[in-house]
Structures are given as structure tokens and as C-alpha cells.
Amino acid sequence: MLNNLEQLTTEKVNLETLNIDEKSPLEIVKVINEEDKKVALAVEKELPNIAKAVEKIIEAFKTNGRLIYLGAGTSGRLGILDAAECPPTFGTSKEQVIGLIAGGREALLEAVEGAEDSKEEGIKDLKNIKLTSQDIVVGIAASGRTPYVVGGLNYANNIGATTVALCCNKDAVITRVADIAIVPVVGPEVIAGSTRLKSGTAQKLVLNMLTTASMIGVGKVYKNLMVDVQTTNEKLEDRSKRIVMMATGVGEIEATEILKNSNYQPKVAILMINTGCSFVEATAKLQEAGGFVKKALEYIKEGEEIC
């Protein structure tokens, strides 16, 4: 499995960049930009498979399942980055979306030699978080054959978890061991084999879609507003205020006051303003609507639930 690297699209020489070392800085970045334009188109071809994965993630979230990213190097770091953004953006627990990387925390800052070459390490990391059949495991590997990821996906399959492969080479090993395969083929890299470039960009775009679409699917977004944002700092407190103002049309003073009364929960504040419900009533109605603000407002408007 460690041989025949030259057969991988991500390892081939890019004929468009053969003389990149002779170009000026402006010419170099223009070439990189032209290559990057191919990434979104490659991802577009995989939208049906991305949507299938989103459907499975939504199902998992609704039954207290988790989304687990598993990767090595750049792929692992991208998974951890996406997972880390979910709590402040969508108000999730730190356990709902988890990123695992070969070599552990040390590998976030520097390469850990040989960490990705062990199938057993991938299995061990999933066992350490007590993976269950309710969870979704997304194995991320540009090459599609990283042993750490292959081992983890096989283990996840064995315990009945749903598995997703995200790679940038057709017919890769992980696509054959996963329930769903997402394969944006971005072509040879600007610098041959440097998959932190187009492959990494494609992976980031896909991960953005997986979490964003899934969070929308479980009521974390109202219209296009992140109404479950956690107000953990001044910037996010200001954002929460603006979200309430945009969703309800009230001014800053009223939005600030209701936000305080709602324990800084934009969802609850929006319901309180738009329906006249108390904090307790709005919280209850929101729960009845499964966390969906729009659905809760519709229930109240239809007279099914009246504060």
C-alpha cells in the first residue's frame, strides 16, 4: 500500500506549473490562483455524495450521535479546525463534533514521524472516545490510503457506525471501506505532492458543507443567522445582539435587554420578542419545535401553542 505513489493523481507532476520556479512572485500567485479555481468545480461534482453524508449526520445528531473526523497531517488538522469551530458557531458541546489526528495534540504543530502509518493508532483513538454505532466517522486523507484512517474506518464499520471517506484520488482504498465516498479530484498540485494546497482546500470546502448543512438540519440556523452562537467574548456578544436585531427588527437597546433576559440565547430572545412569551415559555416552545425557531413561530402563529 506504500508503493506506487506516482499512480496517485495528487502525486503527479502538474504540467501547468513545470516552470513555476522561473516566474516572478506575481506570476506565481496567478498560477496558484488559476489552479485553485479548479477546486470548487471538483467539489461541485461531489455534491450528491456530500448531501448523502449530511443526511446521515443529521440522523446521528437527532439520536445523540457524534460526528468524528479522522485524519493525519493537513487532513487531520483541517478536521480539528472544523470541529473546534462548531461550539462557538452553533452552540454544540465539545463532544458533538470531534477531530482526531494521527500523533495526537503534538501533531497539530509539527509532524510526528510515522504516526499516520499505524492502523492500530486509528483504532485506538476511536476506542479512546468510546465510538458507538450511533456515530458518524469521516476519514480524511488526500491520498485515500493513509493506514491510520484505513484502520479507523474498518473499526468503525465493525461496530456499526456510519463511515464516510473524503479523499482526492479515484478508487482509493478508503473509498472501498466507507459507506459514502466523497472524492473531489482536483488534479496534480502546483508543487507535486503538496496536498496541503488544492487537496487541502477541497477538503476544507467539503468539511464546511458537512457541518454547516447538518447544523441547519437540526435547527441551529434561523433564516441565515447563527442563532445558537455562544457569547463567549465581546465580539460574539455583539454578534448575538445584531442577530436578534436582524431577526426581529428591534433596536439595539431592546435587543440588549431581551438578550440579557434570555440568558444570552439568541433563539430564545427572538421568540420572546416576536411572540411576547416569557423566557420559560419561549424555552418550552423552542424545545417542542425541536430547536427550530421558524417552526416554533409557526406553531404559535397557527394557535397550536399560545403563550
UniProtKB/Swiss-Prot annotation:
GO terms for biological process: amino sugar catabolic process; N-acetylmuramic acid catabolic process; peptidoglycan turnover. SUPFAM superfamilies: SIS domain. The active site is at E85, E116. Keywords: Carbohydrate metabolism, Lyase. It catalyses: N-acetyl-D-muramate 6-phosphate + H2O = N-acetyl-D-glucosamine 6-phosphate + (R)-lactate. PROSITE patterns: GCKR, SIS. GO terms for molecular function: carbohydrate derivative binding; carbon-oxygen lyase activity; ether hydrolase activity. Its EC number is 4.2.1.126. Pathway: Amino-sugar metabolism; N-acetylmuramate degradation. Gene3D superfamilies: 1.10.8.1080, Glucose-6-phosphate isomerase like protein, domain 1. InterPro entries: Etherase_MurQ (IPR005488), Glucokinase_regulatory_CS (IPR005486), MURQ/GCKR (IPR040190), SIS_dom (IPR001347), SIS_dom_sf (IPR046348). Residues 57-220 form the SIS domain. Homodimer. Belongs to the GCKR-like family. MurNAc-6-P etherase subfamily. Specifically catalyzes the cleavage of the D-lactyl ether substituent of MurNAc 6-phosphate, producing GlcNAc 6-phosphate and D-lactate. A lyase-type mechanism (elimination/hydration) is suggested for the cleavage of the lactyl ether bond of MurNAc 6-phosphate, with the formation of an alpha,beta-unsaturated aldehyde intermediate with (E)-stereochemistry, followed by the syn addition of water to give product. This is N-acetylmuramic acid 6-phosphate etherase. It comes from Alkaliphilus metalliredigens (strain QYMF).
